[in-house]
């Protein structure tokens, strides 16, 4: 079974829609193998998003991701990476299909409610960033 990482970002946590988002995953065949609510440090956010360090939005992204708690989860299921990305919708909520997480809960391209791994390779790296093997059941 494939695994992927999901992050419910500070904007969605603040809105109180954690349960609704996790329910969407489960309703669509993704099992929650691990989940925890954490407060990222600036260093952790910089490390996690290091791939974007030379992009103009990097500083704002880091500041946003440390602005409040996040919920990190390992989702497991058939085609988990693709299924999660379909459930999330387009990065820009204005372009996200109706019924997707971002269309329903995101405010902007920056405060876009959720993060999801974009490949199996990145999913493995991202999961290992947040979870030890003993935390994934």
Swiss-Prot record:
Q: Which residues bind ATP?
A: 9, 57, 85, 91, 102, 112
> Does DNA-binding count among this protein's keywords?
no
Location relative to the cell: Cytoplasm
Q: What class of enzyme is it?
A: transferase
What name has this protein been given in UniProt?
A: Nucleoside diphosphate kinase
Q: Which Gene Ontology terms describe the biological processes this protein takes part in?
A: CTP biosynthetic process; GTP biosynthetic process; UTP biosynthetic process
Report the sequence similarity comment from the record: Belongs to the NDK family.
Q: How does it assemble?
A: Homotetramer.
Active site annotation, chain numbering: 115 (pros-phosphohistidine intermediate)
Per its record, the protein catalyses: a 2'-deoxyribonucleoside 5'-diphosphate + ATP = a 2'-deoxyribonucleoside 5'-triphosphate + ADP; a ribonucleoside 5'-diphosphate + ATP = a ribonucleoside 5'-triphosphate + ADP
Chief location of this protein within or outside the cell? cytoplasm
- HAMAP family for the chain: NDP_kinase
Function text = Major role in the synthesis of nucleoside triphosphates other than ATP. The ATP gamma phosphate is transferred to the NDP beta phosphate via a ping-pong mechanism, using a phosphorylated active-site intermediate.
EC nos: 2.7.4.6
Which InterPro entries does the protein's record reference?
A: NDK-like_dom, NDK-like_dom_sf, Nucleoside_diP_kinase, Nucleoside_diP_kinase_AS
């Amino acid at each position: 079974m494939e695994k992927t990482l999901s992050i419910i970002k500070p904007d969605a946590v603040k809105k109180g829609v954690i349960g609704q988002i996790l329910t969407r995953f489960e309703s669509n065949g993704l099992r929650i193998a691990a989940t925890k609510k954490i407060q990222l440090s600036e260093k952790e956010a910089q490390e996690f998003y290091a791939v974007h360090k030379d992009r103009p939005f990097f500083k704002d992204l880091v500041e946003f991701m440390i602005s409040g708690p996040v919920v990190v989860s390992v989702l497991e299921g058939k085609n988990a990476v693709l299924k999660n990305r379909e459930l999330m919708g387009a990065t820009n909520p204005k372009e996200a299909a109706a019924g997707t997480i971002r269309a329903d809960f995101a405010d902007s391209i920056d405060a876009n409610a959720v993060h999801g791994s974009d490949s199996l390779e990145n999913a493995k790296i991202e999961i290992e960033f947040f979870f030890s093997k003993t935390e994934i059941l």
